[in-house]
Amino acid sequence: MISFLLCLALLIIGYFVYGKIVDNTFGPDDRETPAVRINDGVDYVVMPQWKLFLVQLLNIAGLGPIFGALQGALWGPVVFLWITFGTIFAGGVHDYFSGMMSERNDGASIAEVTGRYLGPVMQNIMRVFSVVLLIMVGTVFAVGPAGLIVTLCKNSGMSGLLTTTLFWLIIILIYYFIATFISIDAIIGKIYPVFGICLIIMAVGVIFGIFTNPAYTIPEIWANFSNMHPSGTPIWSFMFITVACGAISGFHSTQSPLMARCMKSEKQGHFVFYGAMVCEGVIALIWAAAGCALYTITDGKMAGLAEALAAGQSAAIYDVCAKTMGGVGIALAMIGVVICPITSGDTAFRSARLTLADWLKIDQDSWVNRLKLCIPVLGVGAFLGIGNALGFINYTVIWRYFSWTNQTLAMIVLWAASMYLFKEKKNYWITAVPATFMSAVSCTYFVLAPECLGKMINTYADGKLVAYNTAVAYPIGIIFAIAMLAIFIHATKKHTASQKA
């Protein structure tokens, strides 16, 4: 329990100390923000700071810090370290700069921002990458809740149309269309802060239930400083990829521009962007602690948690909430596993619309222009979602790549932020160091993971994975990270030389 409290204290201190260093490095000033200057009543709308924070939290969080943290807890309390230091030095930095760089560029989507600092080739790659990723996220966050609602209906004794996934999927997609089309303040700005509060209350209830029940003990890092994963999956870099949103997530960079278009002052960035990420880190830390405390540890392995997760991640959330909060917890869990994914799904589609609008230079003041983008974006999402519901499209393989693409996107954004800071003659190491680290994480995972290149280098017997070839993957990851840093340094020298010429 001491380990948990120390990490919690570090996160809070990190917000006030390192978060302020990050804020001062960027240098917010009194210039007019896009929300004040443009104010189109649709996407550029001034919102109060407390709303900005809660909407940003819900947009970037959803169930990410819960699912990722529970999965990360399979490695044991060592995951506390990554959640804590990853949030302070990588995730918070990433979210802050993705939001503030967007704000300095008229609220542009992350693909456009990246292109301005890394060049047109990377810009086009990011445009395609972002739209595909956002539509995929939005679709999966429609299919998942639809299936959960069906389960709840069946468990309540209902039958007929209400117990079909297709029916609920269509309902959710209709809602997505409306939320993507209308003003951000109409639904997202009014209702989402409530769900953001629910997400926080659920986390507080979980940790309170653990502290007040003598049967639960959060294991200490120093007593369990080992790989406790039941399958022996390597900590590096699988744990760093798996935790995702609980420490750093590239998906956040697609969401931050939404709030960058709604800020009244640049000085709100520290609280809205860095603060929301720290809050998400705290939520992830709590759920990781629950995963470590509530389930049986057998022979130094997290066997009990693995068994709970085998029944499904949603089932694991129900179990944690029921054990720590009783009936109230079950009600909160129902909100969590159904509402939170939907709130991430609709903002994903909204971000896809805005990314396409920036790309194709289609002004979004006119409802006709918004309709031109909403119909194809939601149309693709509907095709994929309905295809999944009818069984002729399978997301299982595609979704395996999400965590990797998520962290790779974060890596690219951090390199873009590094170039931005260099051009502004500011301390670019504050972003270049985590960018280098995430380069190693992404490359190592891509080489080692079975769904990527792992099948080529790992050892298999009778079709089953026997051993990971870390002797090959680890050096490749390190070499790639060093190469990326070298390319960045070369680019800075080239830029300096061109300026002198």
Question: Where are the predicted features?
Answer:
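Membrane-interface loop-to-helix entry segments
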Residues: A9-G27, F129, P145-I149, T165-T212, ...
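Extracellular loop-to-transmembrane helix junctions
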Residues: M1-G19, G72-S102, A111, I330, ...
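Hydrophobic alpha-helical segments and their helix-loop junctions in multi-pass secondary transporters
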Residues: G138-S156, F167-W168, T180, L199-N227, ...
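Loop-to-transmembrane helix boundary motifs in multi-pass membrane proteins
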Residues: P120-R127, L162-I170, G275-A284, C292, ...
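Helix-loop-helix module between adjacent transmembrane segments
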Residues: L10-L11, Y15, Q56, A90-D106, ...
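Hydrophobic, membrane-embedded alpha-helices of multi-pass small-molecule transporters
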Residues: M47-G64, I207-A215, F225-W287, L332-S344
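Extracellular/periplasmic helix-exit of transmembrane alpha-helices
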Residues: G99, G209-I221, G275-D319, I386-I393
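Membrane-interface "cap" regions at the ends of multi-pass membrane proteins
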Residues: L10-I66, Q268
